[in-house]
């Protein structure tokens, strides 16, 4: 086992990365190794997808499957080894079908890629784990060095984050052939074990640029189906009655659940990154979408244990449900998996609803506590002139984009302290689950404009980027000249690709924490600092002083 893709990876003087019987996320060595094997099969599939496009062949089954299966290897998504192997077998079957299509056009069709003809050597998980050793990401570290390995992983993990957003967009009916062609090209190239530093740096920026397009179609999918989010108050306390909790990012799953629970007497609560759903008109119209439950994903083992109903996980993040003994009432959807937990293959939630009706639910309603969400792209752009006016009248000094992933490290209290230290004449724009560090606190307003503005999920960084570009255009300056600072928390691969997106767009002087990614060496961090001004957090006082004086 070697895995260094998330923030909680083991760090030692000898090197970074989980390499024992189990990773810090709870992923076993078996599952981790089989995920490496799956990725290798997906690289072979992408190699043939690139070749097929040379013949004008576009296989939509391949295009929809490849990013989805890659997504299953993202942190805290799928811990179920047999399902990982199932994805690998499906990848090979699709590859062989695509290969046959190519050979039908050109009998001499060949692909020069070491993964192009990979076969699974056994049906036994132990044997497959031994085969997977050929594809462990650091297998040639001694030959290439830590810097090349770090850049490879930056590209691989960034592309994995983009694949997750591609799957979210695909579920909503969004497809862009150029994006998929680019994805396959990069995925196939990474399967050749590239070792050129400049090429890898260029690839990381290409991934960021591609992801901007992915976020654009995801935004179109969400707003096209569910309307543009508008500011909405959400209750974060319990309402009496039977209940279901839904977590993750998949708004379509939430919509289907709301439709199927309507009139059943079962209330629905959002959790984690599903919180922004309350801002969408076509979702909040369901009166039994009664509120948001819990806090950051890392607290789920305590909070889910207390929730008196079933729980549905639509995407990341899931952690061991046996710890809180709720594994008999947590359900996984799509690419999510945990051994022994019931999985919903389709969009029928009747079994979950039946379980909710058999449980007690909340016995009474708590005193409501309302927070505001729903500052989507359209709302943000509508406020652009107001923001400019406030700046011109010196009522608004600075905007801080304070968002990203949450996690368990104690150092993450930095983000709470930073938020509460932001001066009264400054505004906080937030997104992703890092907001749970401060989104239930009161921040007041500036002439009626809330000082805490929740822009949505991690992918809604797109909205923040569009706002920044719009403000810069109206003010006749560059984005980096705005009174705007980005203070981002990271945990997994979606955050990595958001960072690459921002860097590829030329955004500079981003501050990140609580730690640097374990796969980025001091040399690579120095390059990113020199080229983009990217740096790690220090103290709230020092960072606030520096950012306000910039």
UniProtKB/Swiss-Prot annotation:
Keyword vocabulary terms for this entry: 2Fe-2S, Cytoplasm, Iron, Iron-sulfur, Metal-binding, Oxidoreductase
GO cellular component: cytoplasm
Cellular localization per UniProt: Cytoplasm
Cofactor dependency: [2Fe-2S] cluster; hybrid [4Fe-2O-2S] cluster
Keyword hit for Calcium: no
Main subcellular location of this protein, as a coarse class: cytoplasm
CDD domains: HCP
UniProt entry tagged with the keyword Thylakoid: no
GO BP, sorted A to Z: response to hydrogen peroxide
UniProt enzyme class: oxidoreductase
Residues reported to bind [2Fe-2S] cluster: 3, 6, 18, 25
Catalysed reactions listed for this entry: A + NH4(+) + H2O = hydroxylamine + AH2 + H(+)
Family as reported in the entry's similarity comment: Belongs to the HCP family.
Protein name: Hydroxylamine reductase
Native source organism of the sequence: Escherichia coli O6:K15:H31 (strain 536 / UPEC)
Gene designation: hcp
